[in-house]
Amino acid sequence: MTDAVEVLRIDSLEDERLDAYVRLTERELRCVLEPQKGIFIAESAKVIERAVRAGYEPVSFLLGERWLDQMMPLFERLVVREGAGPVPVFVASMELMEQLTGFNVTRGALAAFRRPRQIPVDEFLGGVVEAAGDRPVRVCVLEGSVDHTNVGAIFRSAAALNVDGILV
């Protein structure tokens, strides 16, 4: 284990270091510190790994104890690739994770990441058009959707339909 991977055992959801996972609403997460420095929560090892590969900056990780060995190589790659300082890895019992989420956490891992800067719509669309080359472009626009389950389903459907970009 590298020095920059800081594993911290958690025994209570009252721990202030877990605020992003336990006590903050989606709106509060968007506005943590300043709007441009908000955070978002990623759920599952697969989603976390994709976020890391996409270059999102992790704030912390929270996982069930049985996931630590599986996730440690990802944490170590992140530290080596990014040269990041210590990123806390909070480890809790699976029972505590279930208490947090209200259900059996089969995917066992959560992560808080810094939100990327919001880019202007025209800049986003320009990038989508450029990436598409000569073929027609398909963009999905989400307006007023607040349920993360619906948003996740829409993103998965958009990926299956080869949508080029999603405006949220």
Please state what every model-predicted region is.
Residues 66-105:
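Phosphate/diphosphate ligand-binding glycine-rich loop within oxidoreductases
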